[in-house]
UniProtKB/Swiss-Prot annotation:
GO terms for cellular component: host cell nucleus; virion component. It comes from the Viruses. The keyword Isomerase does not apply. The keyword rRNA processing does not apply. Keywords: Host nucleus, Virion. Self-assembles to form the virion icosahedral capsid. The lineage of its organism: Viruses, Monodnaviria, Shotokuvirae, Cressdnaviricota, Arfiviricetes. It is found in: Host nucleus; Virion. This is Capsid protein.
Length: 369
Protein backbone atom coordinates (compact mmCIF):
# COMPACT_ATOMS: atom_id res chain seq x y z
CA UNK A 1 0.00 0.00 0.00
CA UNK A 2 2.74 2.42 1.06
CA UNK A 3 4.82 1.40 -1.94
CA UNK A 4 1.94 2.11 -4.30
CA UNK A 5 1.45 5.54 -2.72
CA UNK A 6 5.15 6.30 -3.13
CA UNK A 7 4.90 5.42 -6.81
CA UNK A 8 1.97 7.80 -7.25
CA UNK A 9 3.87 10.59 -5.48
CA UNK A 10 6.98 9.96 -7.57
CA UNK A 11 4.87 10.06 -10.73
CA UNK A 12 3.29 13.35 -9.70
CA UNK A 13 6.68 14.80 -8.84
CA UNK A 14 8.00 13.77 -12.26
CA UNK A 15 5.02 15.37 -14.01
CA UNK A 16 5.39 18.56 -11.97
CA UNK A 17 9.11 18.67 -12.78
CA UNK A 18 8.46 18.15 -16.49
CA UNK A 19 5.72 20.81 -16.49
CA UNK A 20 7.99 23.25 -14.65
CA UNK A 21 10.85 22.59 -17.04
CA UNK A 22 8.53 23.09 -20.00
CA UNK A 23 7.26 26.40 -18.56
CA UNK A 24 10.82 27.56 -17.95
CA UNK A 25 11.72 26.70 -21.53
CA UNK A 26 8.69 28.58 -22.87
CA UNK A 27 9.46 31.61 -20.69
CA UNK A 28 13.11 31.51 -21.75
CA UNK A 29 12.00 31.33 -25.38
CA UNK A 30 9.67 34.31 -24.88
CA UNK A 31 12.42 36.31 -23.21
CA UNK A 32 14.82 35.40 -26.01
CA UNK A 33 12.23 36.40 -28.60
CA UNK A 34 11.61 39.74 -26.88
CA UNK A 35 15.35 40.36 -26.64
CA UNK A 36 15.84 39.55 -30.33
CA UNK A 37 12.94 41.86 -31.26
CA UNK A 38 14.38 44.67 -29.12
CA UNK A 39 17.81 44.22 -30.70
CA UNK A 40 16.37 44.23 -34.21
CA UNK A 41 14.36 47.39 -33.50
CA UNK A 42 17.51 49.05 -32.15
CA UNK A 43 19.41 48.05 -35.30
CA UNK A 44 16.65 49.30 -37.58
CA UNK A 45 16.56 52.64 -35.79
CA UNK A 46 20.33 52.84 -36.25
CA UNK A 47 19.88 52.54 -40.03
CA UNK A 48 17.13 55.19 -39.92
CA UNK A 49 19.61 57.60 -38.35
CA UNK A 50 22.63 56.51 -40.44
CA UNK A 51 22.02 55.28 -44.02
CA UNK A 52 25.47 53.68 -44.15
CA UNK A 53 24.98 51.61 -41.01
CA UNK A 54 25.41 47.85 -41.44
CA UNK A 55 23.63 46.96 -38.19
CA UNK A 56 20.88 45.07 -40.01
CA UNK A 57 20.25 43.45 -43.38
CA UNK A 58 16.55 44.31 -43.03
CA UNK A 59 16.29 48.13 -42.86
CA UNK A 60 12.73 49.05 -41.88
CA UNK A 61 10.82 51.78 -40.08
CA UNK A 62 9.47 50.16 -36.87
CA UNK A 63 6.22 52.13 -36.77
CA UNK A 64 3.75 49.24 -37.00
CA UNK A 65 2.42 50.15 -40.46
CA UNK A 66 3.21 46.62 -41.72
CA UNK A 67 3.04 43.18 -40.12
CA UNK A 68 5.49 41.73 -42.64
CA UNK A 69 7.72 43.39 -45.21
CA UNK A 70 11.10 43.16 -46.91
CA UNK A 71 13.90 45.61 -46.15
CA UNK A 72 17.00 46.00 -48.31
CA UNK A 73 19.84 48.38 -49.10
CA UNK A 74 20.56 49.33 -52.70
CA UNK A 75 23.38 51.57 -53.89
CA UNK A 76 25.55 52.90 -56.68
CA UNK A 77 29.34 53.26 -56.40
CA UNK A 78 31.57 54.83 -59.05
CA UNK A 79 34.11 57.50 -59.95
CA UNK A 80 32.93 60.89 -61.23
CA UNK A 81 34.65 64.16 -62.10
CA UNK A 82 33.95 67.65 -63.42
CA UNK A 83 33.54 68.05 -67.17
CA UNK A 84 36.11 69.72 -69.38
CA UNK A 85 35.60 73.47 -69.24
CA UNK A 86 33.36 73.21 -66.17
CA UNK A 87 35.03 74.07 -62.88
CA UNK A 88 31.86 73.65 -60.82
CA UNK A 89 30.03 70.34 -60.50
CA UNK A 90 26.53 70.05 -59.06
CA UNK A 91 24.99 67.08 -57.23
CA UNK A 92 21.41 66.63 -56.05
CA UNK A 93 20.64 63.80 -53.61
CA UNK A 94 16.97 62.79 -53.77
CA UNK A 95 14.74 59.96 -52.41
CA UNK A 96 14.05 58.04 -55.62
CA UNK A 97 13.12 54.39 -56.00
CA UNK A 98 15.63 53.25 -58.63
CA UNK A 99 17.98 56.26 -58.63
CA UNK A 100 18.91 58.79 -55.97
CA UNK A 101 21.64 60.99 -57.36
CA UNK A 102 21.72 63.57 -60.16
CA UNK A 103 25.09 65.01 -61.23
CA UNK A 104 25.40 68.05 -63.49
CA UNK A 105 28.49 69.34 -65.33
CA UNK A 106 30.25 66.00 -65.02
CA UNK A 107 32.58 64.27 -67.46
CA UNK A 108 30.29 61.24 -67.25
CA UNK A 109 27.47 63.10 -69.05
CA UNK A 110 28.01 62.00 -72.66
CA UNK A 111 24.49 61.61 -74.07
CA UNK A 112 23.24 64.18 -76.57
CA UNK A 113 23.39 67.71 -75.19
CA UNK A 114 22.83 66.53 -71.63
CA UNK A 115 25.02 68.10 -68.99
CA UNK A 116 23.61 65.76 -66.35
CA UNK A 117 24.26 62.12 -65.47
CA UNK A 118 22.09 59.78 -63.38
CA UNK A 119 23.66 56.57 -62.08
CA UNK A 120 20.91 54.12 -61.13
CA UNK A 121 21.02 51.74 -58.18
CA UNK A 122 22.65 48.37 -58.90
CA UNK A 123 20.06 45.70 -59.70
CA UNK A 124 17.16 48.13 -59.91
CA UNK A 125 14.51 47.32 -62.51
CA UNK A 126 13.67 50.95 -63.23
CA UNK A 127 10.64 51.95 -65.28
CA UNK A 128 9.60 51.79 -68.92
CA UNK A 129 8.30 54.91 -70.68
CA UNK A 130 8.98 53.79 -74.27
CA UNK A 131 5.23 53.93 -74.99
CA UNK A 132 5.44 57.72 -74.77
CA UNK A 133 5.64 58.99 -78.36
CA UNK A 134 4.91 62.73 -78.22
CA UNK A 135 3.45 65.46 -76.03
CA UNK A 136 -0.11 65.06 -77.30
CA UNK A 137 -0.79 61.30 -77.26
CA UNK A 138 -1.77 59.37 -74.14
CA UNK A 139 0.67 56.63 -73.11
CA UNK A 140 1.49 54.13 -70.37
CA UNK A 141 4.42 54.26 -67.95
CA UNK A 142 5.30 50.89 -66.45
CA UNK A 143 7.02 50.13 -63.18
CA UNK A 144 9.02 46.90 -63.33
CA UNK A 145 9.76 46.12 -59.68
CA UNK A 146 6.27 44.73 -58.99
CA UNK A 147 6.04 46.25 -55.51
CA UNK A 148 2.63 46.57 -53.91
CA UNK A 149 3.91 49.16 -51.41
CA UNK A 150 7.28 50.80 -50.80
CA UNK A 151 8.96 53.61 -48.87
CA UNK A 152 12.44 54.98 -48.21
CA UNK A 153 13.91 54.22 -44.77
CA UNK A 154 17.00 56.40 -45.25
CA UNK A 155 19.22 57.54 -48.09
CA UNK A 156 22.69 59.08 -48.10
CA UNK A 157 25.76 60.03 -50.10
CA UNK A 158 29.48 59.80 -49.37
CA UNK A 159 32.13 61.54 -51.50
CA UNK A 160 35.91 61.17 -51.34
CA UNK A 161 38.47 63.15 -53.32
CA UNK A 162 40.78 60.87 -55.35
CA UNK A 163 43.32 63.47 -56.51
CA UNK A 164 46.88 63.33 -55.15
CA UNK A 165 47.98 65.80 -52.46
CA UNK A 166 49.44 68.29 -54.94
CA UNK A 167 46.08 68.43 -56.76
CA UNK A 168 43.64 68.44 -53.84
CA UNK A 169 42.64 72.11 -53.97
CA UNK A 170 39.00 73.16 -54.21
CA UNK A 171 36.02 73.50 -51.88
CA UNK A 172 32.38 72.54 -51.55
CA UNK A 173 29.11 73.94 -50.21
CA UNK A 174 25.69 72.38 -49.69
CA UNK A 175 22.13 73.16 -48.57
CA UNK A 176 18.92 71.28 -47.88
CA UNK A 177 16.12 71.62 -50.44
CA UNK A 178 12.91 71.66 -48.40
CA UNK A 179 10.67 73.83 -50.56
CA UNK A 180 7.73 72.09 -52.18
CA UNK A 181 8.64 70.95 -55.67
CA UNK A 182 6.26 70.85 -58.64
CA UNK A 183 5.80 68.58 -61.65
CA UNK A 184 8.08 70.67 -63.86
CA UNK A 185 10.97 70.01 -61.47
CA UNK A 186 10.95 66.34 -62.50
CA UNK A 187 11.78 64.65 -65.82
CA UNK A 188 11.12 61.20 -67.18
CA UNK A 189 14.58 60.29 -68.41
CA UNK A 190 17.11 57.44 -68.59
CA UNK A 191 19.83 56.33 -66.22
CA UNK A 192 23.49 55.61 -66.99
CA UNK A 193 23.39 57.53 -70.31
CA UNK A 194 21.05 54.92 -71.81
CA UNK A 195 19.45 55.62 -75.18
CA UNK A 196 16.66 53.14 -74.43
CA UNK A 197 13.67 54.53 -72.48
CA UNK A 198 12.18 51.04 -72.63
CA UNK A 199 13.16 47.97 -70.65
CA UNK A 200 14.49 48.86 -67.21
CA UNK A 201 16.43 51.98 -68.25
CA UNK A 202 13.87 54.64 -67.37
CA UNK A 203 13.96 56.75 -64.23
CA UNK A 204 12.48 59.92 -62.76
CA UNK A 205 14.92 62.62 -61.66
CA UNK A 206 14.74 66.30 -60.57
CA UNK A 207 16.39 67.67 -63.72
CA UNK A 208 14.22 70.80 -63.78
CA UNK A 209 14.97 71.46 -60.12
CA UNK A 210 18.74 71.26 -60.49
CA UNK A 211 18.54 73.58 -63.50
CA UNK A 212 16.94 76.22 -61.26
CA UNK A 213 19.48 75.60 -58.48
CA UNK A 214 22.35 76.22 -60.91
CA UNK A 215 21.25 79.83 -61.28
CA UNK A 216 21.20 80.41 -57.51
CA UNK A 217 24.40 82.36 -57.01
CA UNK A 218 24.54 82.50 -53.20
CA UNK A 219 23.84 79.56 -50.90
CA UNK A 220 25.42 80.89 -47.71
CA UNK A 221 22.23 82.57 -46.46
CA UNK A 222 20.43 79.23 -46.16
CA UNK A 223 19.95 77.96 -42.59
CA UNK A 224 21.22 74.48 -43.55
CA UNK A 225 24.36 75.80 -45.27
CA UNK A 226 27.47 73.65 -44.86
CA UNK A 227 30.89 74.11 -46.47
CA UNK A 228 34.43 72.76 -46.41
CA UNK A 229 37.46 71.74 -48.47
CA UNK A 230 37.37 69.02 -51.10
CA UNK A 231 40.25 67.25 -49.36
CA UNK A 232 38.06 66.87 -46.26
CA UNK A 233 34.96 65.51 -47.99
CA UNK A 234 35.59 62.07 -46.51
CA UNK A 235 34.82 63.53 -43.07
CA UNK A 236 31.16 64.22 -43.90
CA UNK A 237 28.17 62.52 -45.44
CA UNK A 238 24.94 63.87 -46.87
CA UNK A 239 21.52 62.49 -45.92
CA UNK A 240 17.90 63.14 -46.88
CA UNK A 241 15.64 63.86 -43.91
CA UNK A 242 11.96 63.02 -43.51
CA UNK A 243 9.81 66.15 -43.34
CA UNK A 244 6.98 64.65 -41.26
CA UNK A 245 6.58 62.82 -37.95
CA UNK A 246 5.00 59.88 -39.75
CA UNK A 247 5.89 58.00 -42.90
CA UNK A 248 3.26 56.16 -44.92
CA UNK A 249 3.91 53.51 -47.57
CA UNK A 250 3.50 54.49 -51.21
CA UNK A 251 1.02 52.35 -53.11
CA UNK A 252 2.57 51.11 -56.35
CA UNK A 253 0.83 50.40 -59.65
CA UNK A 254 2.55 48.39 -62.36
CA UNK A 255 1.10 50.59 -65.08
CA UNK A 256 0.08 54.24 -65.01
CA UNK A 257 -1.85 55.97 -67.77
CA UNK A 258 -0.60 59.41 -68.79
CA UNK A 259 -3.00 61.69 -70.63
CA UNK A 260 -1.49 63.57 -73.55
CA UNK A 261 -1.75 66.87 -71.67
CA UNK A 262 0.37 65.48 -68.81
CA UNK A 263 3.57 65.80 -70.89
CA UNK A 264 4.83 69.13 -72.25
CA UNK A 265 7.79 67.86 -74.31
CA UNK A 266 9.29 64.54 -75.42
CA UNK A 267 12.79 63.91 -76.81
CA UNK A 268 13.56 60.30 -77.79
CA UNK A 269 16.31 61.01 -80.31
CA UNK A 270 18.93 63.20 -78.58
CA UNK A 271 18.56 63.64 -74.82
CA UNK A 272 15.99 60.90 -74.17
CA UNK A 273 13.85 62.81 -71.72
CA UNK A 274 10.24 63.88 -71.27
CA UNK A 275 9.04 66.92 -69.34
CA UNK A 276 5.87 66.95 -67.23
CA UNK A 277 3.15 69.58 -67.47
CA UNK A 278 2.61 71.83 -64.48
CA UNK A 279 -0.30 70.87 -62.25
CA UNK A 280 -1.50 67.82 -64.18
CA UNK A 281 -2.80 65.03 -61.92
CA UNK A 282 -1.44 62.19 -64.08
CA UNK A 283 2.04 63.70 -64.02
CA UNK A 284 1.87 64.15 -60.27
CA UNK A 285 0.70 60.54 -59.91
CA UNK A 286 3.70 59.16 -61.83
CA UNK A 287 6.19 61.21 -59.82
CA UNK A 288 4.62 60.14 -56.52
CA UNK A 289 4.87 56.48 -57.56
CA UNK A 290 8.65 56.51 -57.95
CA UNK A 291 9.84 59.26 -55.59
CA UNK A 292 9.27 59.33 -51.81
CA UNK A 293 8.38 63.02 -51.57
CA UNK A 294 7.99 62.91 -47.79
CA UNK A 295 11.79 63.42 -47.69
CA UNK A 296 13.79 66.54 -48.48
CA UNK A 297 16.78 66.71 -50.86
CA UNK A 298 20.38 67.87 -50.53
CA UNK A 299 22.09 70.09 -53.11
CA UNK A 300 25.90 69.97 -53.23
CA UNK A 301 28.05 72.38 -55.21
CA UNK A 302 31.66 71.26 -55.80
CA UNK A 303 34.19 73.94 -56.78
CA UNK A 304 36.73 71.74 -58.52
CA UNK A 305 40.16 72.00 -60.08
CA UNK A 306 40.30 73.40 -63.57
CA UNK A 307 39.71 70.84 -66.31
CA UNK A 308 41.21 71.88 -69.65
CA UNK A 309 41.42 68.36 -71.01
CA UNK A 310 45.22 68.33 -70.89
CA UNK A 311 47.67 67.30 -68.17
CA UNK A 312 48.02 68.44 -65.42
CA UNK A 313 44.68 70.28 -65.52
CA UNK A 314 42.26 67.35 -65.62
CA UNK A 315 39.90 68.51 -62.91
CA UNK A 316 38.87 66.81 -59.68
CA UNK A 317 38.00 63.13 -59.34
CA UNK A 318 35.66 61.73 -56.70
CA UNK A 319 34.69 58.34 -55.35
CA UNK A 320 30.89 58.41 -55.06
CA UNK A 321 28.83 56.06 -52.90
CA UNK A 322 25.07 56.59 -52.79
CA UNK A 323 22.90 54.22 -50.74
CA UNK A 324 19.13 53.93 -50.38
CA UNK A 325 17.56 51.78 -47.67
CA UNK A 326 14.04 50.80 -48.66
CA UNK A 327 11.16 48.84 -47.17
CA UNK A 328 8.86 47.10 -49.65
CA UNK A 329 5.81 44.85 -49.60
CA UNK A 330 4.96 42.45 -52.41
CA UNK A 331 1.47 41.26 -53.23
CA UNK A 332 0.87 37.76 -51.86
CA UNK A 333 0.65 36.46 -55.45
CA UNK A 334 4.25 37.48 -56.13
CA UNK A 335 6.83 34.84 -55.24
CA UNK A 336 9.05 37.50 -53.64
CA UNK A 337 6.45 37.78 -50.88
CA UNK A 338 7.89 34.60 -49.35
CA UNK A 339 10.95 36.64 -48.37
CA UNK A 340 8.90 38.96 -46.16
CA UNK A 341 10.03 39.02 -42.54
CA UNK A 342 8.19 40.08 -39.42
CA UNK A 343 8.06 43.84 -38.90
CA UNK A 344 8.52 45.10 -35.34
CA UNK A 345 7.14 48.31 -33.84
CA UNK A 346 8.03 50.79 -31.13
CA UNK A 347 4.70 52.56 -31.55
CA UNK A 348 3.82 55.59 -33.64
CA UNK A 349 4.54 58.12 -30.88
CA UNK A 350 8.03 56.77 -30.15
CA UNK A 351 8.75 56.58 -33.88
CA UNK A 352 7.69 60.23 -34.26
CA UNK A 353 10.33 61.18 -31.69
CA UNK A 354 12.98 59.55 -33.86
CA UNK A 355 11.67 61.37 -36.94
CA UNK A 356 11.94 64.66 -35.05
CA UNK A 357 15.45 63.78 -33.90
CA UNK A 358 16.48 63.25 -37.52
CA UNK A 359 15.32 66.76 -38.39
CA UNK A 360 16.89 68.36 -35.33
CA UNK A 361 20.24 68.75 -37.10
CA UNK A 362 19.34 70.72 -40.20
CA UNK A 363 22.89 71.05 -41.49
CA UNK A 364 23.17 69.79 -45.05
CA UNK A 365 26.36 67.88 -44.19
CA UNK A 366 26.79 65.52 -41.25
CA UNK A 367 30.20 65.10 -39.62
CA UNK A 368 31.24 61.44 -39.41
CA UNK A 369 34.83 61.71 -38.15
Amino acid sequence: MFTALEKVVDTLRLRIFCFSACCNEVNASKKKGKKMSANEIKNQLHVMHDPFSDKTSQPKIPDGKANESLGFATQTVQEVGNAEGANTMHILLFPGQNSGILIDETAQADLGSRTYYIPTFFGSNGLDWDDLADATTAANVRGLDNYALWRVVSTGLQLKLLNPVDQDDGWWESVRVTTENTNVDWYLTTGNNSTQPGGNNGTIAPVGLINSLLSQQTLANEQSYSTGLLRDLHRVQFECHGQRDYHDFIQQRNEIRLAGAAISAVDKTTNYEAQFSLGHDDANDVINQFVDRSYDMVYIRLHCRQNTGTTPFLGSRFHLNCVSNQEVIFDHEERESRFHTRSHTIGSNANSVHMQARRADQNAAKMTM
